[in-house]
Amino acid sequence: MGFQIAIDGPAASGKSTVARLLAEKLGFDHLNTGATYRAVAVYLHEKGLSPSSAEEEIENALKNLKIDYVNGRVYINGKDYTEKIQSPEAGVLASNFARLEVVRRHLVRIQREICDDKNIVVEGRDIGTVVLPNAHLKIFLTASLEARVERKLKEYQKRGLKVTKEEVERELISRDEQDSKRNVAPLKPAEDAVIIDTTSMSVEEVLDRILKLVRERMNT
């Protein structure tokens, strides 16, 4: 088994930036599981399905699903979904579909297959608790709501999306509630996770902290 690093946390806690840069510095593969959930949610929505659809219908739609995550791009059955998953609507869809056991079951299996025997940094909301419970290092990133709203707003503006601060705040509050209260794999730190509050930390400071932990684990 390769060296596996799990990075969990709520939306806009800094997971994606930190995970991507950490993987680059270590020469590891990188998997953004949130992107796979958003892609599958958009895929199911395009097929006319919703979280309230019959489980059998969703199961059938997912049965022969093939997901590839290559250089930060997400492909479903060979079709690139990367641009489609960038909107706030895709994030809300993902949170709604992620509550379903049938969706999580299929995606956890696929995510584990992607990670098998690799040195990899994996980010998401249930990596240390569900997807990779035996990961060599588990990190849980957190930050204040105010800091997360500012980060998400800048991210959307950078993409040219017109959203207000109030809309972003409502989105994050809604996603936090859904992620933490869902019956299947709720968002929470693994018992052996290292919790890092990134509110007043720079990306470089967070990376340095995690790199130190990686070196310690690799040398034991």
Curated annotation (Swiss-Prot):
It is found in: Cytoplasm. The keyword ATP-binding applies. Belongs to the cytidylate kinase family. Type 1 subfamily. ATP binds at G9, P10, A11, A12, S13, G14, K15, S16, T17. This is Cytidylate kinase. One of its GO terms (biological process) is pyrimidine nucleotide metabolic process. InterPro entries: Cytidylate_kin (IPR003136), Cytidylate_kinase_dom (IPR011994), P-loop_NTPase (IPR027417). GO terms for cellular component: cytosol. Its EC number is 2.7.4.25. Keywords: ATP-binding, Cytoplasm, Kinase, Nucleotide-binding, Transferase. The keyword Nucleotide-binding applies. It is an enzyme of class 2 (transferase). GO terms for molecular function: ATP binding; CMP kinase activity; dCMP kinase activity. It catalyses: CMP + ATP = CDP + ADP; dCMP + ATP = dCDP + ADP.
